[in-house]
Amino acid sequence: MIFIIIFGEKMINNLHKYILPFVLVSLGSNMFAQDNKANQNDVEEVVVVGSQIKGASISGALPVSVLSSEDIEALGVDSGDELLAQIAENGANYYNEQDWNGGVNGARGDVGSFNIRNLGTGNTLALINGRRLVQNPSYQTELIGGSYVPVMSVNSNNIPIGGVDRVEILKDGASAIYGADAVAGVVNTVLKKEFEGFNIKARLAAYDHFSTEDNKVSIEFGTDLNDGRTNLGIFFDYYDRGEINANEDPRWADGDWAYKNLDLGPFQGSFRNSSNQGIFGKFYTYGTKKKAWSFYPAGAGKCNQSSAIDLGAAGCLEDSTSSTDRPRTNLNEDRAVRSQLERVNFFVYLNHEMQDGSELFTEIGAYSADSGPRNLYQQSTLGASSTCTSNIQAMIIPAENFYNPLDSDLCKDDYRFPNKPISSTALNTYRLLQGVRGSYDNGWDYEAAFVWSKAYSRNVVENRIGMDLLALALADQTAAAFNPFHGGVVPSNIERTWVDVYRKNETDLLMIDFKLTNNDLFELPGGSAGMLLGYEYREESFADMRDPRLNGTISWTNPWGETYPFVSAVANSSPTPNSSGEREVTSIFAELQMPVMDNLDIQLALRHEDFSDISETATVGKFAFGWQLHEKLLFRGSYQTAFRAPNLVTVFESVVARNNTRSDSLGRYVGDGSDIKDPNDPDTTLFDISRSVQRVARGSADLQPEESTNYSVGFVIDPIENLTIIIDKWEIEKEKSIGLFGEVNHTTLDLLMRLQGGASECVGNPAVERSPADPATAPFFAAAGLCNAGEVIRINDIYTNLDTRIIGGTDLAILYDFYTNFGDFGIKYQHSRTDEFSQTAGGNAATIVSASEAGLLPGIAVQGFSDLIGVDGNFEDKSVITAFWDYKAYRISYSSTEVGEFEESGIRRSDGTKWIIPSMQTQNITFSYNFDIADNPARLRFAVRNLEDKRAPLADETYGYYSKTHSDYGRNYYLELRVKL
């Protein structure tokens, strides 16, 4: 019973799977017929991520980048996401605190994602000490194909920076070595071991432009016990980061950059991220679009019109849709760009050598982070439109409302609630590993380990609007009713509608593995061949638990009868059911390393994986070679296949509706790129071509795994002593990428089908649901030769396997160390260039691409199926430089990171003019001095980060910069003291 309580009934039922590897250890002893107790040799761990064979000679020929602890200190990073940003091969960070486009569906809090090769979140395998990390508990969506698809990643901030010995990046993938899903590569964080001593490190950071301070305390403790047979190590990091508010920076503070800049040329109309929705809204007489009323502040010119209705100090209602005198809402005001954060990373290892020479090793890790409270922007309801009946969350103000000045029901259009929600997020991750390693007398080594890890997240947003409570407050005929016409100067009574909305997530990882290795299996002309045989079993699961007003437990029905699962009871949030799922993966794998000649090493690897939730199995392989053509020239290459099963969310998620503002290609075609206006009243819109559209998608067990090939070929050149030059050409070709056709593409297909059918084709694409056609728009559609149609209400899409995605490029690294009477010098330059990144169109995507190329869809762009290189964070170039000078008690370190330019496609002009976000380089310099404090070695360090005070280039984003690739905090400093006790 105790075991069932601790481990769960499922684990007990599968106990044979967990025991099997340890049984194999015993069988191995009998198989080799050796006395393991007689072997007192030291046990050696695997130290190279490119091969799991100890002492493998092929390891030097594999494309592995390494960031040492000295490199990491020179970079001065405080967290895992900052560390990944300094890796040349890592791309955009889609899990970042400044990107809140996903709302409650985003991965909030102290999160960062792995994205080697910029292939996308979820394509990189993250390890710690050679074994998997649990996925971040909350997930979000990323654009794949034509719309947004759920993606999962390990949280990079789980990495205990203070205990890191080095970070290894295996760039040619490693599916056959570590897991079939290692498509883009592997990031292995190796923590310090066999540590002795007691170090305390304290850091204080400050900024040129902001009043906040960051504080960090790190403790390292290690000691030998049991006459040196046991080593205990403890690493502890505490990080306290202050909030930075948007009001502290002029660019962040106001989202409307259009009026501030006179040099934007053809982009003058862009960069306006304020909103025409505000507390002064626009209202329509319910049931018709013929009568429109706008709410203006007191003193506005419209209030002098004879048709204006005086609302006293709050303002007036006037018979117009004009927004000329209505103030726009600055969504950035009093928002935190960076929230208050407290983070703790804790890691313990215990290594113990047994009497028989084997070693027990234990790892215990814990991570916690509390961020917030953080103000969000003022919110509205979903589906604002002049067509009230097409609004998912229509806000109807009954005629009986105490504050309604008219004798009819009103439907709101451009309106935001006066309050700002407040978000707080707590993250926790725990990890336990227990393993044993040893050696047999005949040269075989064994290692087995059990890993359990669990991650939790809880996000709570206060002061959200409950739609059920809002309906009651609007229907109130007393002075306690909600007053939409408050104008910010009289009470609104909005508090009666407030609710707290939560999202709770969990992920689990349970894994057990067993490996046998022998680096002296048989002799070849070049030396001894090595081999690894292994078995791995793992269970992964996730649970996404939503607030009752989001998951349908508390429902709300809109005025035309729609309810859950298409409508939620929280304003401005789409409905989301609770979801959960689990997967069991069983793997067997082998690796063979053969020095076939003195100057030629070959690596062969094979891995087979079986999945419990999909019908297909995976067999992937790898071939790599290192050919020493000359003592100063190594020619190397590799080819491997990978197999990435659909992530758990895309398999187990049920019906999920999401509202996003999207362009309707049909309306764009009929309106010649503009909204269709009433010819008798230009202020009245008959057909919105860009509006809030609901997309309904669902998980599918029929999804096929993504399959990919990864190859690299290159040279390692050592022209002179201590100088190494590395050049690698690489390419990844991935088939069956999981994505969505997308809302805009569905409307484009709808347009194409109607064009092909002519005026008699009134159905079009069945995936597109439209409101009843307005007779007033019939002449416009007839002029275009099309059947009259209404605005888009809903688009039904499913996760599907798309066609081929290809990415490729070149890596360059130059490493040089030299030693003089004036000190030791070292420099490392790494550059990663992406030459190709494209998503091939297939199926319906190919149909609309062909039609576009034939000129049948003028002015209509196909979304997500094209050349992706140099677009929206997919930069072509990234360079990282680290350098140092050591002389006696002094050390100076330098680092530089440069991210190349790319286009922001969302504001591309109709004539093809592009907005290019230029490259950005930041430089850091660190000064260190070693001395003694009461006979205890100490080090004082002063660092200047972003030496030239570079600010991120302008982008049409929330805070005016592209946060997925750039930081915009400017120059900052830290002072650090380390004492060895």
Task: Tell me what each language-model feature is.
Residues I2-A88, R117, S156-I159, S218, ...:
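N-terminal Sec signal peptide and the immediately downstream disordered periplasmic leader
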Residues L62-N115, G120-G122, R131-S156, E168-S175:
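Periplasmic N-terminal accessory/gating domains of Gram-negative outer-membrane beta-barrel systems
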Residues S138, R251-W257, A300-L341, F347-N351, ...:
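Surface-exposed, low-complexity loop segments enriched in small/polar and acidic residues
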Residues I159, E194-G197, N226-R229, Q355-S358, ...:
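Short loop/turn motifs that connect adjacent beta-strands in outer-membrane beta-barrel proteins
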Residues R658, G823-D932, E948:
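C-terminal beta-barrel architecture of Gram-negative outer-membrane proteins
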Residues T724, E735, D835-S838, S895-I907, ...:
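C-terminal beta-signal and adjacent terminal beta-strands/loops
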